[in-house]
Amino acid sequence: IILLWKFLTFIYPPVIIPKIDSVIKFLLNILSSSLLIKEIIKTLIRMCLGLFFGILASIVCTIIFSKYKLLNEIFYPIVQFLQVIPPITWLVLAIIWLGLGGKPAIMILAISTFPIMTISLMNEIKNFNKNFLQVAQLFQLSSSEEWRYIKFPILYQTFETAFLVCFSTGIKLIVMAELLTTNSGIGGQISTARINIETEGIFAWSIILIFIYYGIGGTLLWIKRTGCIRKLWFHKLSEKVLITK
């Protein structure tokens, strides 16, 4: 990639393809300023809020849909329909409804996360092994205990996979929304660089975004592969079941 980049700098002017040394210089200026941490934190807070609201709504709806068949038949097709609507449509509506700023970014991530997580969890529930539900009957678990001790631990692996998908798309959606709606956050800084025709700034902030993506994404993937949270959860819950019953 670097060799291709170097080659393209001989063909195109710096305003289109900036030189590597100018991008490195701009990147070092960002790293040495207080702007870096402040803007990264703003982007990460928006991403966390968007994921939180989307996942919370998904968990609530999943519990309701699995418990009430009529509501599932009425509203689940709507959830599937939401997945088809492109994020840019929601972004335009969010700007109209909420105005400019960080709120539209949070909204489109929440709406994009909601159908992905809900559909993944509902598909897993439909494929539940009946032996697990028989365990709930054996221990005479209540409905809430059945969710807590049986269904949630089983769904967690599906949740992890869906969460990785939501994260990988979410960080890009947040930056895109910031680019179009605000001058803060990583997307806002890219927008400022675009207005000032600082192509090296766009490249520099994009490099920072790539490192953030692989840093957080790699950590989440490691947690999923090792299964440390899942193992701890099963161990704790098995102890609680034995103590309770």
Where are these regions (language model features)?
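Generic hydrophobic transmembrane alpha-helix motif, especially the helices
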Residues: Q80-I116, E124
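Hydrophobic alpha-helical transmembrane segments of polytopic membrane proteins
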Residues: G187-K224
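Short helix-to-coil transition segments within interhelical loops
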Residues: I125-F128, V135-L155, I195
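Periplasmic/extracellular loop-to-transmembrane helix junction in inner-membrane transport proteins
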Residues: I11-F52
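N-terminal signal-anchor transmembrane alpha helix
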Residues: I1-I11
